[in-house]
Curated annotation (Swiss-Prot):
Gene Ontology MF terms in the entry: flavin reductase (NADH) activity; FMN binding; NAD binding; oxidoreductase activity, acting on NAD(P)H; riboflavin reductase (NADPH) activity
General function of this protein: Catalyzes the reduction of free flavins (FMN, FAD and riboflavin) by NADH. Subsequently, the reduced flavins diffuse to the large HpaB component or to other electron acceptors such as cytochrome c and Fe(3+) ion.
Reaction(s) catalysed (UniProt annotation): a reduced flavin + NAD(+) = an oxidized flavin + NADH + 2 H(+)
Organism superkingdom: Bacteria
Name of the protein this chain belongs to: 4-hydroxyphenylacetate 3-monooxygenase reductase component
A GO BP annotation: benzene-containing compound metabolic process
Length: 170
């Protein structure tokens, strides 16, 4: 199998991996930006740590690294349009994305999305280059949880809501 064919088959296989949709944001002396990401996962709960992967060619990497902090906003099913803004599907400029009324600053000064299922603010403790991506290891310092909302996932190159079914009484 040639390298290009294997790369395409790998991408098709990864499209079958349903993943939570997140907007990863940062703000500080290096600037403010955010990106929609599905390559986000927990590493350990002691100490709370998360891994975030961003394409190495992204112009946002110097901003994330320069600020040294970020926030992972786990989107609810009603926030698909915001996900589309931050992936660049709508043509909305970066600063305009943050002028929406749904943003506030968290305790670490990071952009927190109101209504997100969870917002995890943390400090970037390590950055590794692996192939085409930078892998950020983030030490979580502040967690905001929402009691409302259903999930939003990305599966087969499309957004899908994930709704909790009501449990039948036992």
């Amino acid at each position: 199998m040639q390298v290009d064919e294997q790369r395409l088959r790998f991408r098709d296989a990864m499209a079958s991996l349903a993943a939570a949709v997140n907007i990863v944001t940062t703000a500080g002396h290096a600037g403010r930006c955010g990106i929609t990401a599905t390559a986000v996962c927990s590493v350990t709960d002691t100490p709370p740590s998360v891994m975030v992967c961003i394409n190495a060619n992204s112009a946002m990497n110097p901003v994330f690294q320069g600020n040294g902090r970020l926030c992972i906003n786990v989107l609810n099913h009603e926030q698909e349009l915001m996900a589309r803004h931050f992936v660049g599907m709508t043509g909305m400029a970066m600063e305009e994305r943050f002028h929406q009324p749904c943003w506030q600053n968290g305790p670490l000064g990071q952009p927190v999305l109101n209504g997100a299922l969870a917002s995890l603010e943390g400090e970037i403790s390590e950055v590794q280059t692996i192939g085409t991506h930078l892998v950020y290891l983030v030490a979580i310092k502040n967690i905001i949880l929402s009691q409302e909302g259903h999930g939003l996932i990305y599966f087969k190159r499309r957004f899908h809501p994930v709704r909790l079914e009501m449990e039948a009484p036992v």
